[in-house]
Amino acid sequence: MSILTDEKLLADVAAGMSGHAIAKKYGMTPGNINRRIKRLGARGLGHGGNVSRFVPDGYKVKGTSSLVKPDGSVALQWVKTDVDAERQLKMMQEAIAALTECLSPLEEINLISRDEDTTLLNMYTVTDAHIGMLACEEEGGDDYDTNIAEHLISSWFKSATTLAPNATECLINLQGDFLHFDGLKAVTPTSGHILDSDTRFFKVVQTAIRVIKRAVNMCLEKHRKVTLLIATGNHDLASAVWLREMFKEVYCDNPRVTIVDEQSPYYAIEFGKVMIGVHHGHCSRMEKLDAVFASKFREIYGRTKFGYLHMGHYHHRKVAESNMFITEMHQTLAAKDEYSSNGGYDSGRSATVITYHRDYGEIGRISIPVEMIKDWYGLE
């Protein structure tokens, strides 16, 4: 039995033989034949090879459909393409290599604060920022878009780091739904509900990265140790993941910055005798959170005396105390979109920095309302 070369295989395919027929002819399995035909097609050979030059880079010819005249000539031809995963991976690697050529290391941020208190930790909580959301004053009482969100959140961090005590440590608690939508379509990731958006997704990504980096830099000037927690919300299920991974790489060589690396939507921080738990609020109800955290983080719960749980999701403030934890639901800085306005969901707008003592638990807080930020920084 003769050896099946690429030339023979191409000739048999051109003659109209099926994969099964070719396999029988050469004593091979049909799967083997089909894999070889696909590999040849990926190289622009065989069926559709004469049109492969018209296919964009990153794609390959999957097949062609031809309208043949009675005399055997081709009147029309349709080219069917598919993603060339190997080529697209190579293209992405080339793009990454090109981008990294012009990257320079982050400038070192020096600690400006003096007389720091090693017994304190400041927690800066911003929940439900919804960067990329569109809201208008006529409908919900105030305007909100990506540009407003960036200035509002950045100004809040500037105010909060100025007013808060000089604690040695801080926790930046971005408590979920930092981005309003999670991809190219402005819809919720799981239910597909249409969302009010004001811009393209790449601009939302750029803004989110700038805001987080700016917040970390401000905190590095004030605190010796900065912990960044990017919680997963129901609006940014995927984005929270890549944001965490990206900032892990950005600050991997900075011993003063720690990124909370937890893939479940429940997060716990231990500070002396204090346990701080964070969950966006989309997976567990408020009244259930204490049992979830006591079970999930048994060791931390057993070692600590004071327990505080924090959530968002509902955009209004509520506090409940059980035998195990004090659970707090936080307000948001974002304005009301059409959904919230039409549903009658009305609440105050603020964000809070809470100060914890490692031996005594919460000892102070500063709540900064949106109106105060607008007045201080001339925001409209």
Give the role of each language-model region.
Residues 1-146, 162-166:
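Acidic, histidine-bearing metal-coordination/catalytic regions of metal-dependent phosphoesterases
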Residues 50, 220, 246-256, 261-265, ...:
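Conserved beta-sheet core of the metallophosphoesterase superfamily
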Residues 59-72, 213-230, 277, 307-310:
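N-terminal short leaders/motifs
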Residues 75, 239-241, 268-272:
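Short, solvent-exposed polar/charged micro-motifs at secondary-structure junctions
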Residues 103-114, 156, 289-300:
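Short, motif-level signal for alpha-helix interfacial/capping segments enriched in acidic residues
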Residues 108-129, 137, 142-257:
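Core catalytic region of metal-dependent phosphoesterases/phosphodiesterases
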